């Protein structure tokens, strides 16, 4: 089997960041969708950047240093946006009997559990279309490494419940396979070094 990482594939419900595709002779055998989400910010970091440069003796205009515009993590909008996107895409993957994996940072996952309705999401079920994988940064071997922290899953209705919605993206498996096969380019072939 050959493995490919195919970026930006359009499906009903939007774009999927990546597909991990298992193929043989450039024919799709299996696939999983992968969404990556990092934290967004609100405001601008520019004034803080300018103050840092000033502290290190690098000239910046005084107006930039005195700018009091705040910035920070936009937790609510980031979490809500990705849950809405996952809901739009979940039904497509559910109809195909395939998985869509959301990869997020541990603090964002913890925020989502606290601020949205996640109490119904417990454990991992192979039959669920939507999987959440949260990663943490851990100190190991005198360095920092990513480590899988949490794995849970749900279905389309479960994502809707997270958002407080009452839960159509219909596409045929053959159509997705044809789209993926058209993108099985050598530049996307995954080479594992052991």
Segments from the language model and where they lie:
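Short beta-strand-loop-alpha-helix junction that forms the active-site gateway
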Residues: 35-57, 72-75
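Active-site metal-binding core of divalent-cation-utilizing nuclease and nuclease-like domains
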Residues: 1-47
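Non-catalytic C-terminal interaction segments of nucleic acid-processing enzymes
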Residues: 60-194
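A signal for specific C-terminal beta-sheet/loop modules enriched in small/flexible residues
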Residues: 32-37, 50-51, 122-131
């Amino acid at each position: 089997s050959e493995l490919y990482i195919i970026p930006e594939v359009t499906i009903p419900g939007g774009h999927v960041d990546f597909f991990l595709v298992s193929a043989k002779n450039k024919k799709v055998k299996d696939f999983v969708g992968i969404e990556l989400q990092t934290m967004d910010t609100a405001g601008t970091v520019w004034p803080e950047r300018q103050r840092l440069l000033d502290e290190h003796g690098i000239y910046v205009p005084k107006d930039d240093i005195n700018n009091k515009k705040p910035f920070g993590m936009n937790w609510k909008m980031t979490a809500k946006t990705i849950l809405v996107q996952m809901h739009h895409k979940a039904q497509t993957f559910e109809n195909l009997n395939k998985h869509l994996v959301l990869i997020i940072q541990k603090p964002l996952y913890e925020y989502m559990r606290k601020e949205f309705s996640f109490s119904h999401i417990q454990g991992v079920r192979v039959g669920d279309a939507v999987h959440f994988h949260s990663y943490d940064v851990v100190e190991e071997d005198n360095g920092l490494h990513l480590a899988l922290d949490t794995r849970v899953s749900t279905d389309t209705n479960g994502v809707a419940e997270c958002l407080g919605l009452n839960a159509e993206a219909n596409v045929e498996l053959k159509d997705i396979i044809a789209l993926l096969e058209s993108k099985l380019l050598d530049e996307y072939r995954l080479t594992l070094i052991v």
